[in-house]
A protein has these predicted regions:
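Terminal accessory/targeting
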Residues: 1-70, 86-95, 154, 202, ...
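Residue-identity detector for glycine
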Residues: 8, 22, 29, 33, ...
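Active-site beta->alpha N-cap acidic-glycine motif
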Residues: 38-163, 271-272
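Generic structural signal for hydrophobic
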Residues: 88, 115, 190-191, 256
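Catalytic domains of cell-wall/extracellular-matrix polysaccharide-remodeling enzymes
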Residues: 129-235, 239-255, 261-262, 268, ...
Length: 280
């Protein structure tokens, strides 16, 4: 993708917003017969409590008031993942991959080893990504996580994985349909008991939207939500259906770099913190 002309790209972003938001209302998503995150399922009010502990760390970093950005990718690996990894390599930027292990992406699981070998963080998302299955009960959710850990264990040291992202986010409401109104409260408490940290996001690429948003739209979505943020945790996807995310990624990285952000994995962000994260 060619870099957009700086003078015009912000103006274009505003023109694109109406079309993008309209597409979000029509989201129903499958990738080759398998359910993945869609904007319909993703919470519109994510838990952004990480900002309360990461912002002081950013302000104190080297005494410069440096800003922090974590690039995160859900629902991979897939055929898109090598494109993402190549851009990250070229730009020398770390990322966090919240991986899954469904039937349709099993052949791509060896890419998890490549991600880890390249210094990226591996974190847990889901094995099946079937909301009805995983959110039926706490037992069903943790069984899914166990299946995920077993599937990825040949490619990474699962004993070191202490971070996860709930499908749909920790404040999603779709889970209530299957596990009742307290299912997420219960799962978050159990995650803490098991020594996991869960994290949502405060910048959403909206790349799982119906209609497959263009690279320009994805770029604009990120730019819009990142404006004036000291700490950004960016939600993106590296599925077979989100190759436009890979196309947008070079410009996304360049923009954050131009704005003076420091790139971190989620774990690195925690290490910078001046106090313990709220769900540690």
């Amino acid at each position: 993708m060619k870099h957009y002309k700086k003078a015009g790209r912000v103006f274009w972003c505003h023109l694109a917003e109406t079309a993008v938001l309209g597409a979000l209302l029509l989201c129903v998503g499958t990738v080759r017969g398998h359910r993945v995150c869609t904007q319909h399922d993703i919470t519109r009010i994510p838990d952004t409590s990480f900002q309360s502990y990461a912002a002081p760390a950013a302000a104190d970093a080297n005494g410069t008031g440096q800003k922090i950005v974590c690039l995160t990718f859900d629902d991979g690996p897939s055929s898109t993942t090598p494109l993402v990894l190549e851009t990250l390599r070229q730009k020398q930027v770390p990322a966090t991959f919240f991986v899954m292990a469904a039937d349709n992406n099993r052949k791509y699981l060896p890419l998890i080893q490549t991600e880890a070998d390249n210094g990226h963080q591996i974190a847990l998302h889901t094995a099946s990504h079937e909301y009805k299955k995983i959110y039926q009960s706490p037992e069903s959710y943790w069984q899914d996580i166990t299946e995920l850990l077993q599937a990825i264990s040949p490619y990474t040291d699962t004993e070191k994985i202490r971070y996860l992202r709930f499908p749909g986010g920790s404040t999603n409401t779709v889970s209530r349909k299957y596990g009742g109104s307290d299912i997420m409260k219960c799962l978050k408490a159990q995650a803490q008991e098991k020594g996991y940290r869960y994290i949502d996001w405060n910048v959403c690429a909206e790349d799982a939207a119906g209609g497959h948003p263009s690279a320009e739209e994805i770029y604009c979505n990120i730019l819009r939500e990142a404006q004036n943020q000291t700490v950004c945790v960016v939600l993106m996807h590296d599925t077979a259906a989100t190759k436009n995310t890979a196309k947008a990624l070079p410009d996304v990285i360049d923009w954050f770099r131009e704005q003076g952000y420091r790139f971190c994995t989620v774990e690195q962000m925690d290490r910078l913190c001046t106090q313990s994260p709220p769900n540690s």
